[in-house]
A protein has these predicted regions:
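Generic detection of short hydrophobic beta-strand segments and adjacent strand-loop junctions
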Residues: 74-80, 123-125, 129, 211
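Edge beta-strand at a domain terminus
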Residues: 27-37, 164-170, 176-229
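Predominantly extracellular/secreted and cell-surface proteins with exposed
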Residues: 83-172
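Bacterial Sec-dependent N-terminal signal peptides
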Residues: 3-11, 15-46, 218-229
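Generic short beta-strand segments
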Residues: 52-61, 95-99, 145-158, 185-197
Length: 229
């Protein structure tokens, strides 16, 4: 059986978000305490700047073998920066290759024109994500709250606004950022669907990604990894 491998999530991340569990009354139960301004500044100093210059995305057109298992992903250049003051901090992604999303749109007559237009789209796309620093030790962890990724595509004799939606850290444990034990910054976003010419942008009504990867059907979104080489 072919195995689709999402990028690994460190155990520390799972432990970090344990604060969502309910109070059992146990004296040993610990509650999450927000970081102090000094701790946030420490997190910021370890993540700020244009460190993440690569992205990795799921693709069965690029197959590698690791420990006897096939992995399906490709890497591309990207410009990603984190700036702010440790309190109001934003991760900005510039020159995002939005055409990679064409792989996750179904092969059918209704989506054919959209899919083809997206494959050919070469213009740079930028988007932002609010950064919330969550943990400073043993590793820096931060939550991400990304904007929709918006692009205007020409097809079918008209211009169409297409928005791609990402889960925030509040909706998915697979959207987050961290500083690794090698002091490298990484960020992970889960893009789960798209909407063409939205009627009400304040109330998104996206179509979920629904695609096959190496013969395996997937419908719960795709993970994009931004990382420091």
């Amino acid at each position: 059986m072919k195995k689709i491998k999402l990028f690994s999530i460190v155990a520390a991340f799972v432990a970090a978000f344990a604060f969502t569990s309910c109070n059992t009354g146990d004296d040993n139960n610990r509650y999450y305490q927000p970081l102090t301004p000094a701790e946030k500044q420490t997190c910021y100093s370890k993540t700020a700047g244009s460190r993440m210059r690569k992205l990795a995305y799921m693709s069965d057109e690029h197959v590698t073998a690791k420990d006897g298992k096939k992995e399906y992903y490709d890497t591309l250049d990207v410009v990603t920066s984190i700036h702010g003051d440790g309190k109001d901090t934003v991760m900005t992604v510039n020159n995002f290759p939005v055409k990679i999303f064409a792989r996750y749109i179904p092969e059918n007559a209704e989506m054919k024109d959209l899919k083809e237009a997206l494959k050919k789209y070469e213009m740079p796309v930028n988007f932002k994500s609010v950064v919330y620093y969550y943990k400073v030790t043993p590793v820096v962890l931060f939550m991400l709250f990304p904007d929709a990724i918006t692009v205007n595509l020409e097809y079918g004799g008209a211009t169409h606004k297409v928005k791609f939606y990402c889960y925030s850290s509040g909706n998915s444990p697979y959207t987050f950022g961290q500083v690794t034990d090698k002091s490298k910054v990484e960020a992970y976003l889960v893009v789960y669907g798209y909407e063409v010419d939205p009627k009400d942008e304040k109330k998104p009504n996206p179509t979920a990604f629904n695609f096959n990867m190496a013969g395996t059907p997937l419908s719960n979104g795709t993970q994009i990894k931004f990382f420091e080489p």
